[in-house]
C-alpha cells in the first residue's frame, strides 16, 4: 500500500507543476507516504492491542482524570492537522485501566482521518467499554489548520467538544467537578 501512496504523492507533485525528480523533491513522495502511514496508524490498532491487558480490579469509586493529553489528528475534509489537548475522566465501577492506556486510546482514535466531534465520542465510548465505569467525560480543545491556513484564515480560533456519559451526563455536580478540575493548574 505504501507504494500506491508514494505514487499518488508523486502524481500530486506533478499536477502542482513540480518536478518530483528534482533534488529537493526526489525523496518527498516516499517521505510523505511514510508520514501519512504514521499519522493514520490508528487504523492498524484496536482496543485490545492498545490496552495490552492493563485492566485491573479496584475498589476505587472516585473520579479518575487524565488531563492535558496532547493529540494530533488530520481533518478528514482537508487532510490538514488539528492539534489540541484531551481531558478524559471516568468513574470506576470495580476496575481501572493503566494510566498510559487512556493516552493510548486518545492516540489510537486521533491517528485517523477525523472530525473532532467524532473523535471525542469515540474516545468516550472506548473508555466506557473497557472500564464499565459509572460514567465517562471527554473534553477536547483543538486548533484546526484547515481553518487557520485556508478558508476563513482565523489564526486564533479554537474548537471545544465534550461528551458526557452516565453520571457525568445525569449528575450536574459530577459534571461540574470534572469541568472545574480540568481547569485547575
From Swiss-Prot:
Q: Which gene encodes it?
A: folE
The UniProt similarity line reads:
Belongs to the GTP cyclohydrolase I family.
Is NAD among the key words of this record?
Answer: no
Under Pfam families, the record lists:
GTP_cyclohydroI
Quote the subunit structure annotation: Toroid-shaped homodecamer, composed of two pentamers of five dimers.
EC number(s) reported in the record: 3.5.4.16
GO MF terms here are:
GTP binding; GTP cyclohydrolase I activity; zinc ion binding
Q: Print the keywords alphabetically.
A: GTP-binding, Hydrolase, Metal-binding, Nucleotide-binding, One-carbon metabolism, Zinc
Q: In which pathway does it act?
A: Cofactor biosynthesis; 7,8-dihydroneopterin triphosphate biosynthesis; 7,8-dihydroneopterin triphosphate from GTP: step 1/1
Query: Which Gene3D superfamilies does this one have?
Result: 1.10.286.10, 3.30.1130.10
Q: Which GO BP terms apply?
A: one-carbon metabolic process; tetrahydrobiopterin biosynthetic process; tetrahydrofolate biosynthetic process
Identify the PROSITE patterns for this entry: GTP_CYCLOHYDROL_1_1, GTP_CYCLOHYDROL_1_2
A GO CC annotation recorded here is: cytoplasm
Q: What is this protein called?
A: GTP cyclohydrolase 1
Could you say which residues bind Zn(2+) here? Answer: 75, 78, 146
Q: Which reaction does it catalyse?
A: GTP + H2O = 7,8-dihydroneopterin 3'-triphosphate + formate + H(+)
